[in-house]
Amino acid sequence: MANSKSAKKRALQSEKRRQHNASRRSMLRTYVKKVIAAIKAGDHKTAAEAFAVAQPIVDRMATKGLIHKNKAARQKARLNAKIKAIAA
């Protein structure tokens, strides 16, 4: 347990950030899951619409440091490739 005043403050800040990041990470996963569900259903239009909504959120989370920028790029590329495969 934190002994000094500054250590207590850091512990409180850390917990606050952890909860905030967990909420954001959950939101990100939800949007990505919507795209994946539409892809599995084989619905190109719905998948494309869900991807259009999820894409800026993935980018924003990478900018904020919640996920790595390479992970964001990889996630978007893979989802987009799967959506294009449905159309073909």
Curated annotation (Swiss-Prot):
GO terms of biological process kind: translation
Stated role: Binds directly to 16S ribosomal RNA.
Name recorded for this polypeptide: Small ribosomal subunit protein bS20
HAMAP family per the UniProt record, alphabetical: Ribosomal_bS20
Disordered, as annotated region: 1-27
GO MF annotation terms: small ribosomal subunit rRNA binding; structural constituent of ribosome
A Pfam entry, by short name: Ribosomal_S20p
Species: Shewanella baltica (strain OS155 / ATCC BAA-1091)
Origin: domain of life: Bacteria
SUPFAM superfamilies, per the entry: Ribosomal protein S20 (SSF46992)
